[in-house]
């Protein structure tokens, strides 16, 4: 049953990421991968919130499987972040490479920590 939940959550997470990219990409003027940054930061915030709530006993641990591993695992994307960074390097867009590297990791980590802290405060 857990595997089915992860699969369903993953499908929904991938569709959500596709939708977010469809909203952001047409409005973008620079080569900076803004949609990937948005999904990674918001997904990290949501995962921090989920883990904080689950470890405090406010949501069932089973939610971590379908929502955390499934939905948020598919919604966020380290592989796309890596691919887009390499593509920026190949294009010689060094300014955007450094912005991408400098923002993605720290903002995602901070968002996860904020989500966890926020969830712990709810308990």
Region locations from a protein language model:
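Membrane-interface helix-loop junctions in multi-pass transporters/channels
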Residues: 1-123
């Amino acid at each position: 049953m857990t595997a089915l939940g992860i699969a369903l959550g993953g499908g929904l997470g991938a569709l959500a990421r596709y939708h977010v990219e469809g909203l952001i990409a047409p409005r973008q003027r620079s080569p900076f991968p803004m949609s990937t940054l948005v999904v990674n930061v918001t997904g990290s915030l949501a995962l921090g919130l989920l883990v904080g709530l689950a470890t405090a006993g406010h949501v069932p641990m089973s939610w971590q499987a379908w929502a955390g591993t499934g939905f948020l695992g598919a919604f966020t994307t380290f592989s796309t972040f890596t691919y887009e960074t390499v593509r920026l390097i190949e294009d010689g867009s060094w300014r955007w490479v450094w912005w991408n590297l400098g923002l993605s990791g720290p903002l995602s980590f901070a968002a996860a920590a904020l989500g966890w802290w926020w969830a712990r405060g709810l308990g």
